[in-house]
Amino acid sequence: MLNPSRYRILAIGKTRKAWIQNGLNLYIKRLPGLTITELKDSDLKKEAQSIRSSIKTNELLIILTEEGESLTSLGFANRLKSLGSSRLLFVIGSANGLDSEIKAMANWSISLSPLTFPHEIARLLLIEQLYRAKNICEGGSYHRN
């Protein structure tokens, strides 16, 4: 079973749109223990420094990038399940992306879609997929094949 209290989302910039924040709040309630931390947006080097200082030594670094691995929802759920009790840190960069140093540090790089989304929406998509993955692993009815 997936344990959201072992997951953190680190995002550059603020969530400014109320409807996105409402969606995030809905899934945060469904995923007790999951936290989202927002870091100030800046230039890539300063953002990389903020990200590096936020990574805990026992966390696997998972970044969201255009170049990342593309998965189905079932594939994502199975991959998370295979990581077992690992602590996971999902990082969503700013509109400028992520510094190459952070990309090189990543344990796993994923892409939510070949389409480009505002970074606020990427947060909502990620948290929804985390909820969906948890539901898939628990045999719930949220995900339909």
From Swiss-Prot:
It is an enzyme of class 2 (transferase). Pfam families: SPOUT_MTase. InterPro entries: Alpha/beta_knot_MTases, RlmH-like, tRNA_m1G_MTases_N. S-adenosyl-L-methionine binds at residues 64, 93, 112-117. It comes from the Bacteria. It catalyses: pseudouridine(1915) in 23S rRNA + S-adenosyl-L-methionine = N(3)-methylpseudouridine(1915) in 23S rRNA + S-adenosyl-L-homocysteine + H(+). It is found in: Cytoplasm. Keywords: Cytoplasm, Methyltransferase, rRNA processing, S-adenosyl-L-methionine, Transferase. The keyword Cytoplasm applies. GO terms for molecular function: rRNA (pseudouridine-N3-)-methyltransferase activity. Its EC number is 2.1.1.177. The keyword Methyltransferase applies. Coiled coil: none annotated. PANTHER family: METHYLTRANSFERASE, RIBOSOMAL RNA LARGE SUBUNIT METHYLTRANSFERASE H. Homodimer. Belongs to the RNA methyltransferase RlmH family. HAMAP family: 23SrRNA_methyltr_H (MF_00658). Specifically methylates the pseudouridine at position 1915 (m3Psi1915) in 23S rRNA. This is Ribosomal RNA large subunit methyltransferase H. It comes from Prochlorococcus marinus (strain MIT 9211). The lineage of its organism: Bacteria, Bacillati, Cyanobacteriota, Cyanophyceae, Synechococcales.
